Amino acid sequence: MNIVEQMKDVLKQEIKEAVMKAGLAEESEIPEVVLEVPKDKSHGDYSTNMAMQLARIAKKAPRNIAEEIVASFDKGKASIDKLDIAGPGFINFYMNNQYLTKLIPAVLEAGEAYGETNIGGGERVQVEFVSANPTGNLHLGHARGAAVGDSLCNVLEKAGYEVSREYYINDAGNQINNLALSVEARYFQALGKDKPMPEDGYHGEDIKEIGQKLADEFGDRFVHEEESERLAFFREYGLKYELGKLREDLENFRVPFDVWYSETSLYQNGKIDQALEALREKGHIYEEDGATWFRSTAFGDDKDRVLIKKDGSYTYLLPDIAYHKDKLDRGFQKLINVWGADHHGYIPRMKAAIEALGYDKETLEVEIIQLVHLYKNGEKMKMSKRTGKAVTMRDLIDEVGLDAVRYFFAMRSADTHMDFDLDLAVSTSNENPVYYAQYAHARICSMLRQGEEKGISFEGNLDLTKIGSEKEYDLLKVIGSFPEAVADAAEKRIPHRITNYIFELASVLHSFYNAEKVLDPADEEKSRARLSLMKATQITLNNALKLIGVSAPEKM
């Protein structure tokens, strides 16, 4: 807990003490103290609606209650300069903000660890995200899911959760058979032989590349081979190629995974039969019309679900249940799936399966990623100008740069449709949020370099009483709220809370820079103190940018 959080706790306790001292309520009757930061700075540093909350208990008008709380309040302990009452009974607190300077040495000492909290308490969380079929390039929805999923993992780790990042490889379904048939057609075509593409084939450039690669490497060897053997080889070859490309793309996007989990392994290791048997033992399976059904309506689903069809083939749901059972068997306490919007209707049946297996259905959380629309020159863009095909993640990174893609995708709530303005993403103006944030970091680094060049160091003992202007305190307040922003983003699963924080920190930094001189030739101690404030800001901004996978340049 940093100094800002400590002081808020002291203030909350002193408000309770004042309530009891005024005889307005017993300690057990006092509601939780809520402290808000007023939008208008002239209304103080914090405000509470405690008087309104107590009106029913104290049987008095909120304004009168507020007056009694103020009269009984001990200003000394909570570092308060003054209090006043606004409107129907809001109490505003004006802090003696010198206490904020204690943040500077604390942030400098913490370094990369600044912002860490332990609200997660080491809870084991598995986040499964992206999990795109290994049959083509990653599209914009995958890119958004990758950015959101990775940022969420970073935030959860910073907040004290033990996180495992997992990619589920859909390598067992019909789409892999179609991949093999598509590769076969492109292989024959690369050899100049006629072979039509399958009806549900994949027409991407990558499939042509695989066909050409096979032709170059093996010549016409497979033309004369047994079809089943040829397709088995093409299946493995194509899968390996596509997976290699996916891994490379995600690595370049700064999205690491701890586990790449193969769907095929569920079949090989008997996990599907085990899951089916577990549900059967608990009485949640029945046979009807030659099919095997899961009684999911018993757990809130709108209809029962087929697991094994009449022809003996599995529906998608059965291996998915087996996969989620395996996740739980591995000891994860919370499962977070980051899914595309087309999976929304799938949530109730998966939660039903979790509950049917004997777990709390809330163990599974699903974050939905909504669609992305690209705009250029104010017009919606459907196809890549370069390829004439749907825009891929690679295309987008080539167009606007990696940092812009990561920042923009982390910037909005995942469950809202996103309009991605390509022109804004490459502009070098304050309207571009990633430029605004990175420029703030580069600006701080420039100030630190200037101090170094002039031989002014912030190492050693500092006179932090030299820090005292309104702009400096504004900066310290935002720096001090970083651990709270991390905790909030983690608890609510909203990584975009961090981009909001970054924008706020960059704003107060630019405002400080425009109003104050960091290096004062007439006062070296003041310069040293301000350089230490700049270093604390740089550490905080760098740590925040790292959470969303965005670089922090030292020069721009």
UniProtKB/Swiss-Prot annotation:
<keyword id="KW-0648">Protein biosynthesis</keyword>
<dbReference type="InterPro" id="IPR014729">
    <property type="entry name" value="Rossmann-like_a/b/a_fold"/>
</dbReference>
<keyword id="KW-0963">Cytoplasm</keyword>
<dbReference type="InterPro" id="IPR001278">
    <property type="entry name" value="Arg-tRNA-ligase"/>
</dbReference>
<keyword id="KW-0030">Aminoacyl-tRNA synthetase</keyword>
<comment type="similarity">
    <text>Belongs to the class-I aminoacyl-tRNA synthetase family.</text>
</comment>
<keyword id="KW-0067">ATP-binding</keyword>
<dbReference type="GO" id="GO:0006420">
    <property type="term" value="P:arginyl-tRNA aminoacylation"/>
</dbReference>
<dbReference type="Pfam" id="PF03485">
    <property type="entry name" value="Arg_tRNA_synt_N"/>
</dbReference>
<dbReference type="Pfam" id="PF00750">
    <property type="entry name" value="tRNA-synt_1d"/>
</dbReference>
<feature type="short sequence motif" description="'HIGH' region">
    <location>
        <begin position="132"/>
        <end position="142"/>
    </location>
</feature>
<comment type="subunit">
    <text>Monomer.</text>
</comment>
<keyword id="KW-0547">Nucleotide-binding</keyword>
<dbReference type="InterPro" id="IPR036695">
    <property type="entry name" value="Arg-tRNA-synth_N_sf"/>
</dbReference>
<protein>
    <recommendedName>
        <fullName>Arginine--tRNA ligase</fullName>
        <ecNumber>6.1.1.19</ecNumber>
    </recommendedName>
</protein>
<dbReference type="InterPro" id="IPR001412">
    <property type="entry name" value="aa-tRNA-synth_I_CS"/>
</dbReference>
<dbReference type="InterPro" id="IPR005148">
    <property type="entry name" value="Arg-tRNA-synth_N"/>
</dbReference>
<dbReference type="InterPro" id="IPR009080">
    <property type="entry name" value="tRNAsynth_Ia_anticodon-bd"/>
</dbReference>
<dbReference type="GO" id="GO:0004814">
    <property type="term" value="F:arginine-tRNA ligase activity"/>
</dbReference>
<keyword id="KW-0436">Ligase</keyword>
<dbReference type="InterPro" id="IPR008909">
    <property type="entry name" value="DALR_anticod-bd"/>
</dbReference>
<dbReference type="GO" id="GO:0005737">
    <property type="term" value="C:cytoplasm"/>
</dbReference>
<dbReference type="GO" id="GO:0005524">
    <property type="term" value="F:ATP binding"/>
</dbReference>
<dbReference type="Pfam" id="PF05746">
    <property type="entry name" value="DALR_1"/>
</dbReference>
<dbReference type="InterPro" id="IPR035684">
    <property type="entry name" value="ArgRS_core"/>
</dbReference>
